[in-house]
Curated annotation (Swiss-Prot):
This is Aspartate aminotransferase. It comes from Synechocystis sp. (strain ATCC 27184 / PCC 6803 / Kazusa). Its EC number is 2.6.1.1. It is found in: Cytoplasm. The modification N6-(pyridoxal phosphate)lysine is found at K238. Pfam families: Aminotran_1_2 (PF00155). Homodimer.
Amino acid sequence: MRLTQRVSQVVPSITLEITAKAKAMRTEGIDVLSFTAGEPDFTTPPHIVEAAKLALDEGKTRYGPAAGEPALRQAIAKKLREKNNLPYEAANILVTNGGKHSLFNLMLAMIEQGDEVIIPAPYWLSYPEMVRLAEGTPVIVNTTAATDYKITPEQLRQAITSKSKLFVLNSPSNPTGAVYTPAEIRALAAVILEYEDLYVVSDEIYERILYDGTEHLSIGAVNDEIFQRTIISNGFAKSYSMTGWRVGYLAGELPLIQACSTIQGHSTSNVCTFAQYGAIAALENPQTCVETMVKAFTERRQVIVEGINQIAGLSCPNPKGAFYVFVDIAKTGLNSLEFSARLLESHQVAVIPGAAFGADDCVRFSYATDMDTIKQGLAELERFVSTLA
């Protein structure tokens, strides 16, 4: 069978390869210490589960509107107005099958052959592939630990051409945990507004997972002008431990949302109906479940960051958000694929190679795991690195 050129340009997920290898080792009875999780290790809060159960009992099991249940679209718009200072109405919201789906819909609606999409690296691994599937061109802008892996206004300006259509902003970041300060957000907004046809999509899936009093500012809240150029991608997976529920959303100007809704209507159609009622409960009830989770992540973050920075040859910034640390391994002399493969084979510790995120001199550790695993993993990591000297 001859497949399309479009598909041939898409790179298979490196993370799936590592995960598959770790699972195979476990099947063989080998105990693997995994730091690969891209999801919280907490169960979905009971009140969210109960809301979905009630929806099932009430017969909310049929097809729904492709754009989402009206009550959920209203709840999301209210949240964006009151918590993020983004003046959206329900009509500006599209409920999608997870945050990833919201971005995929967006790329299909906005990007076509010849369009460039600016993506700072390290990046979430699906961004460039989505752009390629939409037949656009990803323009990768490399950042370093010196700027906390954040793109500067000067770098953004230098990357913009007459073909630039979209800038992808992810704060807090996967894989680095970096969070742009309000001043940095305002500076990026000012650059975007220098160019008439440039838009920004702000991926805010980790917005609730913040540390040390860090403030999250949505770029669309800076002023009315940048609001008109902003698209918001978000979801319920990370903040509410709802990764398997597959409920995300896109917020933007009405023509865009209508176009994305049309695309969704001819692909997946509506998100699981009763899952949407769980999402409503997540928004409309007290947020203590999020606070409890973040408290646990805070404790784990301290242990893993201190532990890694005490190992000769390794270093990592202290993340301000999400639940990842991005570890610089350059001094070991190994690239990220070699480092990850050897660490897994010899010391049974699974991490994600930075090559998956556009940074081959780093690896990503997730601390969405228990404290015992973190401590054991750090001990094995130190033993492994000592063999490289």
